């Protein structure tokens, strides 16, 4: 048993800790990209927010404020409600990173995946990538970071999938690449 722990568990925990530490840092060794936060002109959701959080529409995702008290101050989509959120940046931008501040409630891995689609005109979307592996302490907020490398688009459509209680999102950020 000790052999298994030394061989698999300890290296796995080291990789996980490194990933968490790097997820909050914009600069990485070998990555020469310089970032700037890009304002979002408009955000829309295919479904309204749920229950008591109904008063917090998707515009709460781009107000620059992290939630203070869980689902009572976040954009929330409840159990089995997988909406699509469309973000309009106002004009074409070169985006390197998208970050989502999420709060797991029922399971630490509640945010199972996020599908990212991009468009230049808001009509014709192209699948860009699907990101997974977001984990945080239950009841604690964390940033899910998606590296887009360098994609130029005006519209970004995010389609999250849950595996648990639902979606509690406090903020979504788009980080553009400076020239």
Regions found by a protein language model. Give the residues of each.
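Bacterial N-terminal signal peptides that target proteins for export
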Residues: 2-9
């Amino acid at each position: 048993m000790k052999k298994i722990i030394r061989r698999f568990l300890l290296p796995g925990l080291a990789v996980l800790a490194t990933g968490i530490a790097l997820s909050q840092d914009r600069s990485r060794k070998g990555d020469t990209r310089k970032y700037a936060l890009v304002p979002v002109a408009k955000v829309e959701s295919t479904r309204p927010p749920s229950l008591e959080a109904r008063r917090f529409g998707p515009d709460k995702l781009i107000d620059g404020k992290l939630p203070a008290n869980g689902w009572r101050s976040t954009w929330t989509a409840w159990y089995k409600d997988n909406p699509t959120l469309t973000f309009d940046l106002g004009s074409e931008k070169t985006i390197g990173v998208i970050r989502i501040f999420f709060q797991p409630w029922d399971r630490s891995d509640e945010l199972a995946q996020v599908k990212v689609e991009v468009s230049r005109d808001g009509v014709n979307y192209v699948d860009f990538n699907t990101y997974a592996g977001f984990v945080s302490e239950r009841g604690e907020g964390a940033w899910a970071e998606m590296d887009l490398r360098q994609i130029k688009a005006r519209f970004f459509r995010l389609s999250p999938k849950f595996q648990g209680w639902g979606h509690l999102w406090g903020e979504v950020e788009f980080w553009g690449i400076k020239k």
